[in-house]
């Protein structure tokens, strides 16, 4: 019996974040591709939409800085990730630590991580 797309989607839905990251890395190696997002230009026009303030932000770890151990500890403390997940996140930068958080929460997390010497972006 052949595996269907639904079977694959169900298997991925039951994976942890780290398992999905490992799956993506394995697929990149197997097929010689990159899973990096392609930048797409937004629709032209509507000047009113450009004035709207962003309400949800992503906190992205862009670099571990000089002290990798301190970076892993800071990521664990700030996100609640386990040791293995935090280590993988630090080593695979850029890595999105939090998605869809408020501006205040994103800035607080970013400042906490920057104090530990980690390079962080709020998008």
From Swiss-Prot:
Signal peptide: none annotated. Keywords: Ribonucleoprotein, Ribosomal protein. GO terms for cellular component: cytosolic large ribosomal subunit. Pfam families: Ribosomal_L12, Ribosomal_L12_N. One of its GO terms (molecular function) is mRNA binding. GO terms for biological process: translation. Gene3D superfamilies: 3.30.1390.10, Single helix bin. Forms part of the ribosomal stalk which helps the ribosome interact with GTP-bound translation factors. Is thus essential for accurate translation. PANTHER family: 39S RIBOSOMAL PROTEIN L12, LARGE RIBOSOMAL SUBUNIT PROTEIN BL12M. HAMAP family: Ribosomal_bL12. Belongs to the bacterial ribosomal protein bL12 family. Homodimer. Part of the ribosomal stalk of the 50S ribosomal subunit. Forms a multimeric L10(L12)X complex, where L10 forms an elongated spine to which 2 to 4 L12 dimers bind in a sequential fashion. Binds GTP-bound translation factors. This is Large ribosomal subunit protein bL12. It comes from Hydrogenovibrio crunogenus (strain DSM 25203 / XCL-2).
């Amino acid at each position: 019996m052949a595996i269907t797309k639904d079977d694959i989607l169900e298997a991925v839905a039951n994976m942890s974040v780290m398992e999905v990251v490992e799956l993506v890395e394995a697929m990149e190696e197997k097929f010689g591709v990159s899973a990096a997002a392609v930048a797409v230009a937004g629709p032209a026009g509507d000047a009113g939409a450009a004035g709207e303030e962003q309400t949800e932000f992503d906190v992205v770890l862009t670099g571990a800085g000089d002290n990798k151990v301190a970076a892993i500890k800071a990521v664990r403390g700030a996100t609640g990730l386990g040791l293995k997940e935090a280590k993988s996140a630090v080593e695979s930068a850029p890595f999105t630590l939090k998605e869809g958080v408020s501006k205040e929460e994103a800035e607080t997390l970013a400042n906490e991580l920057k104090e530990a010497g980690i390079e962080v972006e709020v998008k």
